[in-house]
């Protein structure tokens, strides 16, 4: 028995059908201690040398993506010496001073507001996180699964 649906970022080479659910804005942050130790980077290419927190699932772990002026993506292979398996763990590591991180803007905003994290802005913004409902076959998708996908799309897009 296989699963009927999963929620994740887009799979590039997949036989699954992907329905976009939500776009989550992201930002680059670091703890004040990291900024004190390494300074504030002025170019995204500096992340190739600076300590960065990467997420195992996102872009297969190492590269970070930024949106360029033309709306396309620029990928930087960062110095990802600390890898985690969730955005929550990346946030905790960033607050602890492990390194620079790309996090969901909404999730880290309280820590930016209270000074535990510093947001670092560049001409190229961090690529947003895209979440999709993935399922194998539209024709045989059970009604309850289709209803769940429709509900999530409606709730997350508002």
Mark where each language-model region is.
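C-terminal regulatory
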Residues: 11-131, 157-158
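Short amphipathic alpha-helical coupling segments at ligand-binding clamshell hinges
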Residues: 104, 140-152
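A bilobed periplasmic-binding-protein/Venus flytrap-type ligand-binding module shared by bacterial periplasmic
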Residues: 131-140
């Amino acid at each position: 028995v296989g699963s009927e649906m999963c929620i994740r970022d887009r799979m590039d080479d997949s036989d699954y059908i992907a329905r976009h659910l939500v776009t989550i804005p992201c930002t680059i942050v670091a703890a004040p201690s990291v900024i004190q130790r390494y300074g504030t980077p002025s170019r995204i290419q500096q992340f190739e040398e600076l300590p960065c927190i990467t997420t195992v699932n996102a872009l297969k772990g190492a590269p970070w993506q930024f949106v360029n002026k033309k709306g396309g993506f620029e990928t930087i292979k960062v110095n990802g010496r600390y890898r985690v398996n969730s955005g929550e763990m990346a946030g905790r590591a960033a607050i602890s001073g492990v390194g620079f991180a790309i996090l969901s803007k909404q999730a880290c905003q309280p820590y930016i507001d209270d000074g535990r994290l510093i947001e670092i802005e560049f001409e190229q913004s961090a690529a947003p996180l895209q979440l999709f409902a993935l399922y194998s076959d539209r024709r045989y998708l059970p009604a309850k699964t289709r209803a769940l996908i429709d509900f999530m799309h409606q709730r997350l897009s508002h």
